[in-house]
Amino acid sequence: MTAQTPIHVYSEIGKLKKVLLHRPGKEIENLMPDYLERLLFDDIPFLEDAQKEHDAFAQALRDEGVEVLYLETLAAESLVTPEIREAFIDEYLSEANIRGRATKKAIRELLMSIEDNQELIEKTMAGVQKSELPEIPAAEKGLTDLVESSYPFAIDPMPNLYFTRDPFATIGTGVSLNHMFSETRNRETIYGKYIFTHHPIYGGGKVPMVYDRNETTRIEGGDELVLSKDVLAVGISQRTDAASIEKLLVNIFKQNLGFKKVLAFEFANNRKFMHLDTVFTMVDYDKFTIHPEIEGDLRVYSVTYENEALRIVEEKGDLAELLAANLGVEKVELIRCGGDNLVAAGREQWNDGSNTLTIAPGVVVVYNRNTITNAILESKGLKLIKIHGSELVRGRGGPRCMSMPFEREDI
């Protein structure tokens, strides 16, 4: 890595040097049962304990020599001038689906009144309850303002933000600034936009952009895996479609980031398997976790770039042999989440037993609750760093979901 290339990620397993997290904040306390589906949650974490668990996760990474960055801090540091700060507020408001001109004006005044940049960023993440706004004089109300709604928010919270893996993905020296599956999460990508445009270290064109949030087709970082300096893996999933992958790959190949091939994994389209990294992660040079339920229906395509066009071939045969051939190792072992017990596999996959974060070859961060999968991983010689996640897991994401590497050592 040099001063000109502040992002450097050419594997899933190289020693992790720098990582981006988001500490859960007040956005979690703006979850309520009636609107969980709208906000892509199944349950409501207890914020105080979720923060303790997240702080312990961050400390476990620091204890292994990883520098921990925070999304909210980098975003605040990106508002480097009053003009950029105001532009951020206006763009945030334009994407917030605010009903009513007078309401939008009141929220703008609220945000402009917040002097501290980090406090401003955290407020935009938390959302705005209607009860926080002053009463709007009747003469200033438009029709939309006058038609009362029982919905309690003027602006929705962004409770999924602690899953920093998804709004953008680091790939080599570049970044994919994603267009996400849902309106709820697509708003999250504004922070990445300002970081990679205006931040003193990461902005100013220092990081090549291989996908843009203004695209119309969807892709999320949980479906983008860097297997080696030559090979990427992408998932065609509930959250990522094939058209997005084609756009991403053309940009990656055209910008000469060094990658020679992409393996595209097509698997079941449902919330249980929302991303590739919820069912498949790399934990060592020759070892992967996998959820056994996807193996039967999995289809894999090899994609290369020849004569300024994508060349796509459906792969047949054994997945382990395919991975070994592409990674240049003699043999690859697929370690099943939950072992051979379908009940354990289903339970532990739901609790992100397959969603591991590798911080060095064979050194893996996992939730301690997935005892069967963890015992199997340890029996294969892997060193596990076990973290508590009883509250964090309620958002349906594990250690990989909660982290975005900015720098890894090459392998």
From Swiss-Prot:
Disulfide bonds: none annotated. One of its GO terms (biological process) is arginine deiminase pathway. It catalyses: L-arginine + H2O = L-citrulline + NH4(+). GO terms for cellular component: cytoplasm. Pathway: Amino-acid degradation; L-arginine degradation via ADI pathway; carbamoyl phosphate from L-arginine: step 1/2. The keyword Cytoplasm applies. SUPFAM superfamilies: Pentein. Its main location: cytoplasm. One of its GO terms (molecular function) is arginine deiminase activity. The active site is at C401 (amidino-cysteine intermediate). Its EC number is 3.5.3.6. Keywords: Arginine metabolism, Cytoplasm, Hydrolase. It is found in: Cytoplasm. Belongs to the arginine deiminase family. This is Arginine deiminase. It comes from Streptococcus equi subsp. zooepidemicus (strain MGCS10565). The lineage of its organism: Bacteria, Bacillati, Bacillota, Bacilli, Lactobacillales.
